[in-house]
């Protein structure tokens, strides 16, 4: 609904991204200390979570970072030289939140990177991988999820 969307944008505007990364760091510490885990970690995020995954891949000791239609990555490129592990970023061709100019800027910034892969999905919009969402695109979601799972398998095993 429009009310829910407006509330979501209000909360988004108030969100402290660095505190979000700190929360992820705390979660990762707990996972690494838990004897029932392998100690390997990855961060996967969608929308704002895509930005958090990007920043986690830059600032934290993780084995992989994956972002779907991450908003605001272009404003945080000063961290890109800190990437030490594989990162995959998925974008939608028709995404007004991550427009063509932004995707081009990201492609230019990561074109020579062996660690960062960018994937653009033609004819798709923001939220294309969210099952049940208005912009859900089954084919693109399956392709992006297959790519994501392959990176996770390679990085975490």
Model-predicted regions and their roles:
Residues 1-157:
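N-terminal cap/leader regions of alpha/beta-hydrolase-fold enzymes
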